[in-house]
């Protein structure tokens, strides 16, 4: 059984033969490891595919989050201008939605209008050929995080408290932007699942999240699952007050940040879905020594009542780009030192 099949079985609710493990994200980190500049992907997707294959081919990770760090690319389909910021994730030069009426006109989305998304798709195709045994999980923003990316901040702040219909419109636009990338990837058989980080929802009231945003997260997951892909939700930040709400999104796997008990999350989730996380990526993987790292992994897994059932060992969030590769390998190797 290869790594791809391992994760497929975990998501299907089957018991694992070994402890599943993966890096979450890792895009910006992997581009640095491969000596790649993000803005060059449109000119050389094959070079990116080979570079990332060299990086991930040397790592014992079951999942590759393809496109991690490049979540804003589909905004090109509605006129977004990308801002490349060195080793940081590209965002937009300016918000596309600067007044409420703007959201109504952004209806036609063609991935052909996004050169960077087209290049990303070709990069993923090349990576799939080189690493066919890994579970490929493509990333894009969650619906409300898209709203924060696309909207003038002062406009969104006002609408969050005064105009739920506007929030619904921009969340629906976010769903369509993500689908514009996911659908061609799924149609070509290039990915096994999708992942959306939607940590921006921790900045809004729980009732707004539950009543307005979750239906759009669920809409995206339902559409993708109908095409046979797995659905991952990553939530980071101050998630403690929302953690019981996340299963309502319909996700197959929820990957959680540090700051909450992985054991408590597993108890909430394990009868319905997979729990992943939440070894502290900053203080443990990036900043800790080998002994600290192994201890933290062992303590995290010890909080899981049945680590071989609906659980994946992961960091709490994305790797800092300058994380030493030996720390990453050590984290993944810890999975094989945990008694099964």
Which positions does each model-derived feature cover?
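Residue-level detector of alpha-helical secondary structure
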Residues: 6-9, 47, 51-55
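Short, structured active-site "lid" loops
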Residues: 40-50, 59
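Alpha-helix termini
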Residues: 48, 73-75, 241, 263
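Short, basic/glycine-rich phosphate-binding loops at helix/coil junctions
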Residues: 97-105, 195-196
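Glycine-rich, N-terminal phosphate-binding loop and its surrounding beta-alpha-beta segment
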Residues: 51-81
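Active-site loop segments of alpha/beta catalytic cores
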Residues: 1-30, 35-41, 62-66, 85-92, ...
């Amino acid at each position: 059984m290869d790594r791809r099949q391992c994760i497929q079985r975990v998501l299907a609710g089957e018991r694992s033969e070994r402890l599943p493990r993966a890096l979450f994200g890792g895009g910006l980190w992997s581009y640095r490891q491969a000596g790649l500049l993000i803005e060059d992907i449109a000119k050389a997707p094959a070079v990116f595919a080979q570079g990332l294959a060299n990086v991930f081919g040397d790592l014992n990770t079951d999942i590759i989050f393809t496109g991690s760090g490049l979540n804003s690319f589909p905004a090109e389909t509605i006129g977004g201008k990308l801002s490349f910021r060195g080793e940081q994730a590209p965002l937009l030069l300016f918000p596309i939605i600067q007044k409420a009426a703007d959201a109504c006109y952004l209806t036609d989305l063609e991935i052909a209008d996004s050169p960077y998304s087209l290049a990303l798709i070709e990069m993923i195709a090349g990576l799939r050929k080189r690493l066919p045994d890994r579970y490929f999980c493509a990333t894009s923003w969650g619906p409300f995080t898209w709203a924060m990316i696309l909207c003038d901040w002062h406009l969104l702040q006002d609408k969050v408290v005064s105009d739920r219909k506007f929030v619904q419109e921009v969340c629906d636009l976010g769903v369509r932007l993500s689908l514009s990338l996911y659908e061609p990837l799924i149609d070509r058989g290039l990915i096994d699942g999708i992942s959306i980080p939607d940590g921006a929802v921790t900045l809004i009231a729980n009732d707004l999240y539950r009543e307005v945003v979750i239906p759009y997260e669920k809409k995206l997951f339902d559409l993708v699952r109908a095409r046979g892909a797995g659905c991952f939700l990553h939530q980071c930040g101050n998630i403690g007050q929302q953690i019981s709400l996340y299963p309502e999104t319909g996700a197959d796997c929820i990957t959680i940040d540090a700051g909450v008990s992985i054991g408590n999350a597993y108890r909430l989730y394990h009868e319905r879905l997979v729990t992943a996380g939440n070894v502290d990526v900053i203080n443990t993987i990036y900043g800790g020594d080998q002994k600290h790292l192994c201890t933290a992994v062992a303590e995290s897994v010890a909080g899981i009542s049945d680590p071989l059932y609906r659980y994946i060992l992961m960091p709490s969030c994305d790797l800092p780009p300058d994380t030493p590769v030996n720390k990453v390998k050590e984290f993944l190797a810890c999975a094989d030192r945990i008694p099964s």
